């Protein structure tokens, strides 16, 4: 009952999925030219808003997600709270290990530390969350302008989370909801993805949102 309509984007020609009777409406979008992550979700949002009865909430979902219990009921409760910009679940691996989906602000120094000495503990400050599973109030996603489509892949989730917080919205962690996400880490393995990642980081670090967020970001209190 939590899901009203699902939009499936076919970013390149592929066989259609086997028809199944779902308890919600399923609609497909077919791109003539492959688009980036943010552009695809913005397109789905525009189509949803054009429906006769558009949903009050909009979920961004990766195709490699799974779950054993419906995560949407607790996510909807969290996203309906005052000042909620988006709600997100706990992400775990197929072996039930907690993913590092909550991150601190990426800087050249922090990324170097991450690759030289990986630390998978929860960061002292959560500045952004990966966009594998996010639930937005539709009015918030619309007013914030959705994803910045200049980010073809990578960092569009960082940019969106920073812009949400600059507008006074909160990133709502929802411990009652859990999804399984097998992160591909393609930028660690494929040169093309690595170049996309580097280009997106360069764009992020030179963006107005990044500069504004760093200026207003207060130092963490040491315990």
Give the ranges of each region predicted by the language model.
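Active-site-adjacent helix/loop segment of glycosyltransferases
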Residues: 159-223
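Short, flexible, basic/aromatic active-site loop/helix in glycosyltransferases
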Residues: 105-127, 131
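Acidic donor-diphosphate engagement hotspot in glycosyltransferases and nucleotidyltransferases
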Residues: 40-41, 69-74, 157
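Short beta-strand-to-loop acidic/aromatic patch adjacent to the donor-nucleotide binding site
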Residues: 54-66
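Glycine-rich, basic loop-to-helix element that forms the pyrophosphate-binding segment
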Residues: 32-50
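Conserved donor NDP-sugar-binding/catalytic core segment of glycosyltransferases
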Residues: 65-100
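A short, conserved alpha-helix in the catalytic core of glycosyltransferases
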Residues: 128-145, 150-178
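Acidic donor-binding segment of Leloir-type glycosyltransferases
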Residues: 1-33, 51
């Amino acid at each position: 009952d939590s899901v009203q309509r699902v939009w499936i984007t076919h970013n390149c020609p592929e066989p259609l999925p086997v028809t199944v009777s779902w308890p919600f409406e399923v609609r497909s979008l077919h791109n003539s030219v492959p688009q980036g992550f943010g552009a695809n979700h913005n397109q789905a949002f525009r189509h949803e808003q054009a429906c006769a009865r558009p949903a009050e909430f909009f979920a961004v979902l990766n195709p490699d997600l799974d779950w054993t219990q419906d995560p949407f009921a607790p996510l909807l409760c969290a996203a309906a709270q005052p000042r909620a910009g988006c709600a997100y679940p706990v992400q775990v691996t197929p072996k039930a290990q907690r993913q590092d989906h909550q991150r601190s602000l990426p800087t050249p120094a922090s990324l170097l530390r991450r690759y030289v000495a990986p630390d998978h503990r929860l960061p002292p400050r959560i500045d952004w969350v990966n966009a594998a599973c996010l639930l937005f109030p539709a009015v918030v996603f619309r007013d914030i302008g959705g994803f910045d489509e200049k980010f073809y892949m990578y960092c569009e989730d960082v940019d969106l989370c920073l812009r949400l917080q600059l507008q006074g919205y909160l990133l709502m962690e929802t411990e009652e909801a859990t999804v399984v996400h097998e992160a591909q880490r393609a930028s660690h393995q494929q040169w093309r993805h690595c170049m996309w990642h580097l280009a997106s980081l360069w764009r992020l670090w030179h963006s107005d949102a990044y500069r504004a967020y760093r200026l207003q970001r207060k130092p963490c209190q040491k315990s």
